[in-house]
Amino acid sequence: MKKILALFSLGWSLNLMAANDISTMKQTNTQAKKYTNELFLHHTLTKEFSSKINRIKYNLYISLPKGYSSNNKSYPIIYLLDADYSFALAKQISEHLSDRNRINDSIIVGIAYANPNEYKKNRTRDYTPSYVSSGGYGSEYQKYSGGAEAFYRFIYSELIPYLHQTYRVNQNSTFVGHSYGGLFGVYLLIHHPEVFNHYIIVSPSLWYDNHLVLKAAQRKRNFNLQQKTRVCFIIGDHENKGDYRMIDDLKLFNEIIMSKPHKNLSTIFNILNDMDHDTVFPGA
């Protein structure tokens, strides 16, 4: 874990350095009409995908393993939320570890949006399980909240079938979500756990709507699943702040799961040292 954390931290630092370099380059080349050498990610495809279910336009970032075109193998698949910031980091770190035989090659799919400038609106709409008029990013964005069920149906009924028809994907699937994205992952675990068989849930916003999902978990009779499912909960050690007791909330959710019958479901709980809500994702 410490080695992986160090690699993620390095990747995060490089991302910040690159962002600063790009900002400087824009300032010093304001007269240039275009850049002739643009940065791109190898083995990565992009696709616009319009959902018929929630009528939202998504951008998919799809990373294929290096040897994908030269063999007939089927691969595990990883689904990333908040792909506009998570995809490049996860792809580069995964390839680094795969090249050293530390992890298996995987297809990585990042779910992003046609208009990244509407970041707060998009994730408030898609990742939250209920309508709440205030809180979160504020009432300006909360008026779009409560679209988690429609987002689930988009993933389950449209996105997953498309990817399985288009690429050589096996049955090993992983969900990755942070903050509101982690909240959506917990929502899936409670209401639709069959979608994925691995979950990496980082600092989920379990406080949302007066701890709505925690209450739903407490009402659930059991967490018995049809397929073996493994969940990794990750949170920073600086995430109990003021009214937001995010470490306590996540510990409670894990305890609720483990206190009920939970056939085929196992969990891992990690608290990362010297991490807060903003810095924990690269270390996850």
Question: What are these regions, as identified by a protein language model?
Answer:
Residues 177-181, 185:
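Gly/Ala-rich beta-loop-alpha elbow adjacent to hydrolase catalytic centers
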Residues 4-13:
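Sec-dependent N-terminal signal peptides
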Residues 234, 242-284:
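C-terminal catalytic histidine-bearing segment of alpha/beta-hydrolase fold enzymes
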Residues 167-178, 199:
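Alpha/beta-hydrolase fold nucleophile elbow
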Residues 187-197:
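Conserved hydrolase catalytic core segment
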Residues 113, 200-208, 238:
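Active-site nucleophile loop of the alpha/beta-hydrolase fold
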